[in-house]
């Protein structure tokens, strides 16, 4: 699963996801992509599950690019622990995704297979998404 090799700080604030994506909104690598339509935190597990579903649907033909990276640690406290006594330890990593962000890109497969593969990948994600194509494709 994806996670940073090293970070400046061990724990991070929760924060909020405001506004639309500034960068990463256009297809840069592949011919087809999956675009986020709502703000959400996507975990490394969800990204990996989606990637596996896409590559399996493509029967390992073509190429897949992951355009988001989980760089935010999420900390949790153990079950049945009283409030207070500090913040919990980091448990997993998430990527903050804003609307308009391209999540995955693929190429090297027919348009109908690309649509089907990205639909299977989108089912593994906690957000509404949209299938996008490069101008002139399909």
Curated annotation (Swiss-Prot):
PROSITE patterns: RIBOSOMAL_L16_1, RIBOSOMAL_L16_2. GO terms for molecular function: rRNA binding; structural constituent of ribosome; tRNA binding. One of its GO terms (cellular component) is cytosolic large ribosomal subunit. GO terms for biological process: translation. The keyword Protein transport does not apply. It comes from the Bacteria. Keywords: Ribonucleoprotein, Ribosomal protein, RNA-binding, rRNA-binding, tRNA-binding. It holds the Pfam family Ribosomal_L16. Signal peptide: none annotated. HAMAP family: Ribosomal_uL16. NCBIfam families: rplP_bact. Part of the 50S ribosomal subunit. Binds 23S rRNA and is also seen to make contacts with the A and possibly P site tRNAs. Belongs to the universal ribosomal protein uL16 family. This is Large ribosomal subunit protein uL16. It comes from Gluconacetobacter diazotrophicus (strain ATCC 49037 / DSM 5601 / CCUG 37298 / CIP 103539 / LMG 7603 / PAl5).
């Amino acid at each position: 699963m994806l996670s940073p090799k090293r970070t400046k700080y061990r724990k991070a604030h929760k924060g909020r996801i405001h506004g639309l994506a500034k960068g990463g909104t256009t297809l840069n690598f592949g011919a087809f992509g999956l675009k986020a339509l709502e703000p959400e935190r996507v975990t490394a597990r969800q990204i990996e599950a989606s990637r596996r579903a896409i590559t399996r649907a493509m029967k390992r033909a073509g190429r897949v690019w992951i355009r988001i990276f989980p760089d935010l640690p999420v900390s949790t406290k153990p079950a049945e622990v009283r409030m207070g006594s500090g913040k919990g330890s980091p448990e997993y990593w998430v990527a903050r995704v804003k609307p308009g962000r391209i999540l995955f890109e693929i190429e090297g497969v027919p348009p109908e297979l690309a649509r089907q593969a990205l639909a299977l990948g989108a089912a593994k994600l906690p957000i509404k998404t949209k299938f996008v194509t490069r101008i002139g494709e399909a």
